[in-house]
Design a protein with these regions (language model features):
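Long, low-complexity C-terminal extensions of enzymes
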Residues: 334-474
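FAD/FMN-dependent oxidoreductases across multiple families
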Residues: 248, 258-368
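Residues forming anionic-ligand binding surfaces in small-molecule and nucleic-acid pockets
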Residues: 112-124
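Dinucleotide-binding Rossmann-like beta1-alpha1 core, especially the glycine-rich loop
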Residues: 6-106
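Conserved beta-strand scaffold positions in the cores of enzyme catalytic domains, especially
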Residues: 74, 80, 154, 286, ...
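Predominantly flavin-linked oxidoreductase catalytic cores and closely associated redox partners
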Residues: 122-270, 329
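Glycine-rich FAD pyrophosphate-binding loop
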Residues: 1-5
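Short secondary-structure boundary/capping segments
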Residues: 6-10, 200-204, 322-323
Length: 474
């Protein structure tokens, strides 16, 4: 479904919905906690910023003075207006920098040494949204085990042929051992092979290559440090960026780059120069994989739905691939199964929604690249003029106001745009000042700014160390 080992809070929520405990994933899949993403050196200045997940405890400030009718967090507006770093008022960033997770021990349980009998997670109070990092191979195997335990039949084999009925619906799969599997509905999860959606149905591909040029990645592993980070790190490189994902026993890393500017050999050389040593590569030839940013315009055709890499892939910067898959599954199963045979309107709605989601993701990814750096041909590609039209319109609006809910749609919050935009000065300090000077709600945020900074620091001290949290749930 995805190319990496990270995800968004949708995955953690989805596992919770499926009654797969977080402790199970920590025990069996080398899982760690993800509070958000740390973007390092994207302005070529050695600095960093975060796109953190939201808090769930309103006392922490972002929501305490931010109700449904306000377009953006007054505390974020205050930090920009004061020329202060957003990181000083972002609780999830603070706990990430302290190698902590947004969980506190319940007072009575801490005082009396209470140990829950049901699940160790019950000993903690969650005060922020999280996702997980995971060993992809171990997670796939664990989900297969759980599926078998719950009655799912697993057939191991390689598909040799896909047969269609007179209406062009998939009615059977033939394996290499000539075993035949009768089908009434099919999910194409064949990854970049796109076995059915691409090779059988020849669906139309919508490419983002014109404005998202990265198309290759070289994965590698490095050793874990004493402290386990509670975030994914995205480190800007000369011709792309490097992901660094902490598992319990190692970091999973990779260099995502533009192959029109450097070769695979040059990418490997840049990796080793950056690290100062040769890391462990999954492949002996130090090779990687290629991909094309885009999505199918019709991921659902007849009785086949493509999910994950088979349907779309933008790039792994915001760990969106599994997120899109979960949203797709959720939309499919909102409909009664007996409608699937004659479901043209349902299919059209699904396809429209998934393409719209991928378009939104591609815009948000491009926005990350609109940095202040211009040291290589790669970074010079990401100008306002080359941006998607809808993104240009958003940026034009942000010259006179802060990002709002109407900009965000259902996929990104206005805070998400502000986190990224404030890092490379797309969000204007004078605009934020105008909000505070002319709005009582935003002035309230500014007046309470110092209080919330101090209160958040206090709450950070109450949160649990990441490694201790993982050990406690094993």
């Amino acid at each position: 479904l995805g190319a990496g080992e990270g995800s968004t809070p949708y995955l953690a929520d989805f596992f919770d919905h499926l009654n797969i405990p977080l402790s199970d994933l920590i025990k069996n899949c080398d899982a760690t906690i993800k509070n958000g993403i740390k973007f390092t050196n994207w302005n070529n200045d050695g600095e960093f910023y975060y796109h953190g997940f939201s808090t769930t405890d309103k006392s922490l400030g972002f929501d305490a003075v931010y109700d449904r009718y306000l377009s953006n967090s007054p505390l974020m507006a205050a930090s920009i207006a004061l020329n202060d770093s957003v990181k000083k008022i972002d609780f999830m960033e603070k706990i990430s920098e302290a190698n902590k997770v947004p969980f506190t021990l319940e007072a009575n349980k801490r005082d009396f040494g209470f140990v829950s009998k049901k699940d160790p997670i019950d000993d903690y109070k969650k005060i922020g949204n999280i996702s997980i990092h995971f060993n992809a191979t171990k997670l796939a195997n664990r989900l297969k085990e759980i599926g078998k335990e719950r009655g799912i039949k697993v057939v191991d084999g390689t598909i040799k042929n896909v047969s269609l009925d007179k209406d062009n619906y998939v009615n059977g799969l033939t394996l290499e051992n000539d075993e035949k599997i009768v089908c009434d509905f099919v999910f194409d999860c064949s990854g970049f092979h796109r076995l059915i959606i691409g090779k059988v149905y020849d669906a139309k591909w919508k490419s983002y290559k014109d404005f998202l040029p990265v198309d290759s990645a070289v994965p590698f592993f490095v050793e874990m440090t004493d402290k386990i980070p509670s975030y994914t790190e995205a480190i800007a490189m000369k011709y792309g960026w490097m992901w660094k994902i902490p598992l319990q026993n190692r970091f999973g890393c990779g260099y995502v780059y533009d192959s029109s500017l450097i070769s695979e050999e040059e990418a490997v050389k840049e990796i080793e120069e950056f690290l100062g040593y040769e890391p462990t590569y999954p492949r002996k030839d130090k090779g990687g994989f290629k991909f094309s940013a885009g999505c199918y315009e019709e991921p659902w055709i007849n009785n086949c739905v493509a999910l994950g890499l088979a349907a779309n892939f933008v790039e792994p910067l915001e760990a969106t691939s599994i997120w899109v898959s979960i949203v797709g599954l959720t939309q499919i199963f909102e409909n009664p199964l007996w409608l699937f045979k004659n479901s043209k309107d349902i299919r059209q709605e699904f396809n429209k929604n998934i393409v719209s989601m991928n378009n939104s993701i591609s815009e948000f990814i491009y926005f990350h690249y609109m940095t202040l750096r211009n040291d290589t041909e790669f970074w010079n590609k990401f100008s306002y003029e080359n941006a998607p039209k809808d993104l240009q319109e958003k940026i034009n609006k942000w010259k006179v106001r802060l990002p709002s809910k109407s900009d965000s749609g259902e996929h990104w919050t206005s805070n998400s745009w502000t986190f990224v935009g404030s890092a490379h000065d797309t969000i204007n300090k004078d605009v934020a000042k105008a909000y505070i000077e002319n709005s009582a709600d935003y002035k309230k945020g500014a007046d309470m700014y110092d209080y919330y900074k101090k209160y958040q620091d206090y709450k950070v001290s109450e949160c649990v160390d990441h490694r201790q949290f993982l050990e406690g749930l094993k």
